[in-house]
Amino acid sequence: MSVLEQEKKSGKVYIETYGCQMNEYDSGIVSSLMRDAEYSTSSDPENSDIIFLNTCAIRENAHAKIYNRLQSLGYLKKRNPNLVIGVLGCMAQNLGDDLFHQELPLDLVVGPDNYRSLPELIQRIRKGENSISLTRLSKIETYDEIEPRVVNGIQAFVTIMRGCNNFCTFCVVPYTRGRERSRDPKSIVREVQDLVQKGIRQITLLGQNVNSYKEQDTDFAGLIQMLLDETSIERIRFTSPHPKDFPTHLLQLMSENPRFCPNIHLPLQAGNTRVLEEMKRSYSKEEFLDVVKEIRNIVPDVGITTDIIVGFPNETEEEFEDTLAVVREVQFDMAFMFKYSEREGTMAQRKLPDNVPEEVKSARLTKLVDLQTSISHEQNRARIGRVYSILIENISRKSEKQLCGRTPCGRMTVFPLPQETNVSGMIGSTVSVQIESATSATLKGRILA
């Protein structure tokens, strides 16, 4: 490569990530691709030649956040007209060229399946093109060989599949991420082996429907077994699954292997069968409760968390009460709870009226949050006196004299740093912690000698 070509390609890339862990992982993929193309990464947008916003499209406020952020970057574009600004991810895929009609300082719009093209697209911008959009969905792209290096201390995310085939009526993911395709299991094993060599002790496997993983003759349970057999990773977690894909042999594997953490995120979305049918969730209230019963029969000390939407189109007060009844019956450890908001391009937006008044949605959400907070507190209080094996993940955000980590069943736990102990030497170690008190969000305890 000539000096001139090197100068044209060189530059500092800043990536700002919004949304889920999958986006965090994808930002790692983009960083790796840009490094391979001889760009360097930057932690400062003010001192960068390229700014990427890796975006989310799941919630209504996600779009507003990005519009506001792009407007706030306008002064950098005025100061440096050669600055390249791109929107990546689900919002890019969802809105495409429409983003260029908003009078925003924007050069590139690139969907999740097109990140390999970023270096070439930047060169086209630098040669004078503008407003380039690339949002093709792929049936095969999994970025198998890319090393994203998405590491947080002693834990890391590993994407094992991309896309979704379920087409829930409220969800934009199948339209922004494409159809399901799974990575080669051998490439996943290699990635985890590499992470272990780098000091990673815990991984979280990612996918839009992570337990729908299927590649060659390997299903999700088979992949877990490979990771248990062929790597020394200490703890394996996963998110987000679908309730329809919990075969008995997967649960038995969890019950028999302490390295496969008994921590399941099981999205309910609604507790009324008619509403679930409108959502196209492919299970009834009774079928969901049967899945919960089987999980708890096979994995007694499991932690179960969930997602719930209130105010879905045509949801009546009685149907909302059904959701509250399911929450009381299941006793979730924790829940992510949201008011329904229309997402452009979804079946619900096209076919169903957003006809539950905003004040009713807000009242229902408040009622649900109050109920779940009370349940979470009781669930955590029931753990007082118990002893858990906890992998120390970090220093507590509230005090440098406190350490934190999660129980195998997923509850965040904080406990004092032992006197005359080096903090850095503790992070990544596994200790026995006795629980002494609890809030709705956190367990508090002490390390046993």
Curated annotation (Swiss-Prot):
Keywords: 4Fe-4S, Cytoplasm, Iron, Iron-sulfur, Metal-binding, S-adenosyl-L-methionine, Transferase, tRNA processing. Its EC number is 2.8.4.3. Residues 150-378 form the Radical SAM core domain. One of its GO terms (cellular component) is cytosol. One of its GO terms (molecular function) is metal ion binding. It catalyses: N(6)-dimethylallyladenosine(37) in tRNA + (sulfur carrier)-SH + AH2 + 2 S-adenosyl-L-methionine = 2-methylsulfanyl-N(6)-dimethylallyladenosine(37) in tRNA + (sulfur carrier)-H + 5'-deoxyadenosine + L-methionine + A + S-adenosyl-L-homocysteine + 2 H(+). Binds 2 [4Fe-4S] clusters. One cluster is coordinated with 3 cysteines and an exchangeable S-adenosyl-L-methionine. [4Fe-4S] cluster 1 binds at residues 20, 56, 90. Coiled coil: none annotated. Residues 381-449 form the TRAM domain. Pfam families: Radical_SAM, TRAM, UPF0004. The keyword Ribosomal protein does not apply. [4Fe-4S] cluster 2 binds at residues 164, 168, 171. Residues 11-127 form the MTTase N-terminal domain. Transmembrane segments: none annotated. GO terms for biological process: tRNA methylthiolation. Belongs to the methylthiotransferase family. MiaB subfamily. Monomer. Catalyzes the methylthiolation of N6-(dimethylallyl)adenosine (i(6)A), leading to the formation of 2-methylthio-N6-(dimethylallyl)adenosine (ms(2)i(6)A) at position 37 in tRNAs that read codons beginning with uridine. This is tRNA-2-methylthio-N(6)-dimethylallyladenosine synthase. It comes from Leptospira interrogans serogroup Icterohaemorrhagiae serovar Lai (strain 56601). The gene is miaB.
